[in-house]
Amino acid sequence: MPPITFESLLQAPYRPPDVVTDPFDGLTPDWIWWAKTAPSSKGSNKRAPANQNAIATDVRSEEQTVSQQSSRDEVEEILVCVIHGGCWSADFDRVHLRPLCTYFADQGLSSVLPEYRRCGDQGAGWPGTFTDILSAVARAKALALKRGARLVVFGHSAGGHLALWLNAKGLGCSADHLGDRETFEFDAVVALAPITDLEAYGQGSGSCQVMVEALITAGEVVNPRDISPRFGETWSKELVIAAALDPIVPADQTQGYASERKGECIVMEGIGHFDALLPGHPACESLAQILSDLVSRDGQPVGARQ
């Protein structure tokens, strides 16, 4: 099977989000897809049907939708905050992940897909891009707490970099300079083909690699090491996934990151950079299962632990 292209993601079918929130701070709204079934654990095909009468469509108010959702069957919910990639460039927005979020919902995973300022947008770079991510995930956490759901932060490529940055403490320019300890407690952080060392990655000449310079100079000029998760410590449980045939973010970068940190790494054999994002591809099915299994290893939703 040939590697999946970015254009394949744009052409894949999807459902519109169940919720389009009000814009935050004048930025674009969050898009939310509610799970249409209950999440399953590994080795089980059980899918508890949701109360379809409680599924919101064309809803503008998140508060109203949360109220409507209270009549759903009492099942443990997983909420995935999906951070899209695209080389931190304004040329690539979140729309290519609408099919993935639709698929997640069909597999029992609710998802929120925020947007953030990217190079070419006013206010991008440090700190704008990063505070947008911090704010988006804080909103997702508040929603997860309200619903008693498990929260997974998931990012792909440049979005994987931002997810891991959010989960890294002690960097020169890290999220823990912008919030308190509780802000960074999630059930899990998962990064697919993440860019983990900007200094090393930016030495290449690929179309995504050259965007490192744009990212570190778009706002306040920062040292790439100061926003590279490789040089920080983790707040919450973390898993990285490498695509063995990835020409954009080589698998050895992801594997090296996990090895240095003695963290978890899964290598998906025989796939490229975008394969796991396309519904219908076996790697996409594996990704959804990984997210479900990861948060089922311990017992309680975020915020409920002692």
List PLM regions with ranges.
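Primarily recognizes the serine-hydrolase "nucleophile elbow" in alpha/beta-hydrolase
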Residues: 138-139, 143, 148-204
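Short, surface-exposed "cap/lid" segments of acyl-processing enzymes
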Residues: 74-75, 80-103
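Acidic catalytic loop of the alpha/beta-hydrolase fold
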Residues: 198, 245-249
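Catalytic nucleophile-loop/oxyanion-hole region of alpha/beta-hydrolase
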Residues: 91-101, 113-149
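C-terminal catalytic histidine-bearing segment of alpha/beta-hydrolase fold enzymes
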Residues: 252-306
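Short beta-strand/loop motif that positions the catalytic acidic residue
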Residues: 234, 240-242, 246
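N-terminal cap/lid segment of alpha/beta-hydrolase-fold proteins
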Residues: 2-47, 54-68
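Mobile cap/lid helix-loop segments that gate and shape the active-site cleft of serine hydrolases
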Residues: 8, 13-17, 199-230
